[in-house]
């Protein structure tokens, strides 16, 4: 049999199962928003706990929160950050667009934990009040966007940047000895002039290097925190200097360069910084989609495709075709990239709906950004472990395709002109003969002269 306790808010009393620490506003949200199963991300909950910890410390230093209350709030946030109360944050993303219910969920749980420590009884509003003490000098309108920024930075630094460094290092290590492997290039999916396999992979490496640079650039505005703007950006009920001191506390605790936002009206009414950051995630997805698809194409086969790369064989690929093995890691990564691109569309629409003094699409913005970070990080690490590290060049196939290519004729352009070189290529293709045979047949070039000019090793750099 379940035990219940009575909590209350401005709408009256409500029953809450005794084992949970939340209060009336959280319970009402649970009952009013039975929509989907997409709960607020765990890292956002952690960001809110960090926020409440730092706010309590500043309020105490400013003389607005007595030591006993401040210490109890500080201890409660520590326990939350240690993962002790994970089942006490049950609210879904689909709630008020300001994130008020989740902000109050945190306020109520912290107050309840603190009250239990001080009185032996969870819940209630005394001696620690969820609004008057835990939420002191704050509004959901500045607290939730602050938590959004903290969560984005932490997720990026803890998950995404390490994952991108992982694939960067793996691509560098894998391709470092491929500078002597000369293969045929392809443009428009048609044969082109040669390059080395290392040169081809250097393009992918640079894309990842640029991705890391883009992240650092986009994070600069995400480091700016809205806290101190309170309801509409004026800072009502927040003391002068609270915003600066708060940002310093968060920076110290997280070891990240957070600062107070110079204009709180912008920080509450718009989320351009997060839209920009989502755009960076979208660009990373574009880069990864290109890299993964190239590896998919280069590994196509095993007998009837390009077959220039051997991809690791991790599991059976077909329920009907015996022996078939598919590029499953590529498929997983490219599906993630598709999801991230879709997430950015959602963030773009949500970011554009900042009406007057407050954007009220905050939960869906942060949900999609954090999902994109998590999916990109996990899929990249999986791709590295189960695909990139096991890539091997198929030297025989690479050499065969290169030597058959008609585009080696490009080396003849400076010597016999574009039109004559084109005649050789067309003649070779039409009659199924080699370029050398076609050149001799058309009396355009001797075999000796051809062999001196058409050297793939000399075609992979400027003359």
Curated annotation (Swiss-Prot):
Catalytic site: 188 (proton donor/acceptor), 318
Binding residue positions for substrate: 98-100, 129-132, 139-141, 187, 319, 324-326
InterPro entries according to UniProt: Fum_hydII (IPR005677), Fumarase/histidase_N (IPR024083), Fumarase_C_C (IPR018951), Fumarate_lyase_CS (IPR020557), Fumarate_lyase_fam (IPR000362), Fumarate_lyase_N (IPR022761), L-Aspartase-like (IPR008948)
Intrachain disulfide bonds: none
Segments for region (Disordered): 121-141
A Pfam family matched in the record: Lyase_1
GO cellular component: cytoplasm
GO biological process, one term: fumarate metabolic process
Chain positions of site Important for catalytic activity: 331
Subcellular location: Cytoplasm
Major enzyme class: lyase
Gene3D superfamilies named among the record's database cross-references: Fumarase/aspartase (C-terminal domain), Fumarase/aspartase (Central domain), Fumarase/aspartase (N-terminal domain)
Pathways per UniProt: Carbohydrate metabolism; tricarboxylic acid cycle; (S)-malate from fumarate: step 1/1
Catalytic activity: (S)-malate = fumarate + H2O
A GO molecular-function descriptor: fumarate hydratase activity
Assigned EC number: 4.2.1.2
PROSITE patterns tied to this protein: FUMARATE_LYASES
Keyword tags: Cytoplasm, Lyase, Tricarboxylic acid cycle
Miscellaneous comment: There are 2 substrate-binding sites: the catalytic A site, and the non-catalytic B site that may play a role in the transfer of substrate or product between the active site and the solvent. Alternatively, the B site may bind allosteric effectors.
Family in the record: Belongs to the class-II fumarase/aspartase family. Fumarase subfamily.
Summary of subunit composition and partner proteins: Homotetramer.
Function: Involved in the TCA cycle. Catalyzes the stereospecific interconversion of fumarate to L-malate.
Protein's recorded name: Fumarate hydratase class II
Gene name per UniProt: fumC
